[in-house]
Each structure stands twice: as C-alpha cells, then as structure tokens.
Design a protein with these regions (language model features):
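Membrane-embedded catalytic cores of phosphoryl/pyrophosphoryl-handling enzymes
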Residues: 116-209
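Cytoplasmic juxtamembrane interface segments
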Residues: 1-12, 170, 198-203
C-alpha cells in the first residue's frame, strides 16, 4: 500500500480511546443514572411509532439486518485483498469488533431499574446499528484515502437512519444508538491498526535491500 494511503499514526489510537471513553460515558450517564434513564425513555416514547406504522417499517429492519451486513462486510474484505492482505485483514478485524462488542456488552453490563417502569435487560449498544457501522468500518479501511470522507459521511448517515428506525420501532433507546457509533469508532481504529501493522518493518527491509 502506498505511504500516502496510510492513516496518521495517532489516528487509530485516537479513535479507539475516544470510542471507549464515549461508550463508558454513555453507559454511566444514560444507564446508571435516574435522569439518564428518564431522558432515554422520554425520547423513545416520543418517537415510537404506532402499531400500523411499525408493521410497515419492520421489513426494512430485515433488509438492512446483521446477516445482510455480515455478507456485505465479507465482500468488502475480499475486495480489500486487491490492496494487500493486511488491508483485507484490517477490514475484517474492524467489522468483527463492531459485530461482537454489542453482544458481549449487552450480556456483561447490567441495567438497574432506576426510572424504567419495569425491570429491563441492558440493550446498549444496538447490534443492528453496530452491524451497519461494521460495514462502514470495513469500507473505510479498504477505500483509498480520497474516498474516505464521502464514505464516512454517507456511512454515518446510514447508521443514523438505522438508529432512527430502531427507536421508531421501539427496539432501542437513543443511548444505544450513540453507543453503537462509539463501537464503530473502536472498530475503525482497530482496523487501521491491523492494516498498518508491519508496514514499518516492510519499509525498513526494502531500504536495507
């Protein structure tokens, strides 16, 4: 891969640190406080669709669900092989982080009943929104630097639309969607780290020869 296509060395760590801090902050503020749960529930109840509209919107959730996103991520990783195996591996690593992290956190993090009307399991982060973020992360690793801005803007919009759909259907709260965006940051940073791994050794070996 050309040097000019590699990210700045600090960018992966900025993304991973920022995403982790955002994820922790959202959990502590939105899930572990009374005011956070009240705000989350108020937004959910305000935006939640009626039954008739929800039935019409539900098929969209399947069309852009995790299974479809996993297939698209695999295709992006295969396309990444044209730019080198580390690029393909980085795209896959970023996607896996986005796909696995929500499932682990939803099981590991408890949701205390502070302002909820009844005991509820933790739903932070959203797996569906994180699956869309997984595809965005894979693309951000694979595409040339000149296209990353457009992919980032369109991808962020796609995650936002999926998030709005999930809230409208009553499946997730606003904090769940924001947490998925943080997971996306961590996934992107991880993908960039894997992509850039070994590049310094390659450059050194080439110079020595």
């Amino acid at each position: 891969m050309p040097d000019h296509d590699l990210p700045p060395p600090a960018l992966p760590w900025v993304l991973i640190t920022g995403g982790t801090a955002g994820l922790l902050g959202l959990y502590l503020l939105a899930v572990r406080t009374v005011s956070g749960q009240r705000l989350d529930n108020a937004v959910l109840w305000r935006l939640e669709a009626d039954t008739a509209l929800a039935e019409r919107l539900l098929p969209l959730l399947t069309l852009a669900g995790p299974v479809v996103m996993i297939v698209l991520c695999a295709l992006v990783c295969l396309a990444g092989l044209r730019r080198g195996w580390r690029t393909a591996l980085g795209a896959g690593a970023g996607a896996v982080v986005c796909l696995v992290t929500p499932q682990v956190l939803k099981l590991a993090l408890p949701r205390p009943q502070l302002a909820d009307p009844w005991p509820l399991p933790n739903s932070l982060p959203s797996g569906h929104a994180a699956a869309v973020a997984a595809l965005v992360c894979a693309l951000l690793v694979v595409v040339p630097r000149s296209a990353r801005g457009a992919v980032l803007i369109l991808g962020s919009a796609a995650v936002g639309v999926m998030g709005l759909l999930l809230i409208t259907l009553g499946h997730h709260r606003l904090s769940d969607i924001a947490a998925s965006a943080c997971v996306g940051m961590i996934g992107w940073g991880t993908g960039l780290l894997v992509q850039a791994s070994g590049h310094g050794e390659t450059v050194t070996a080439s110079a020595a020869s």
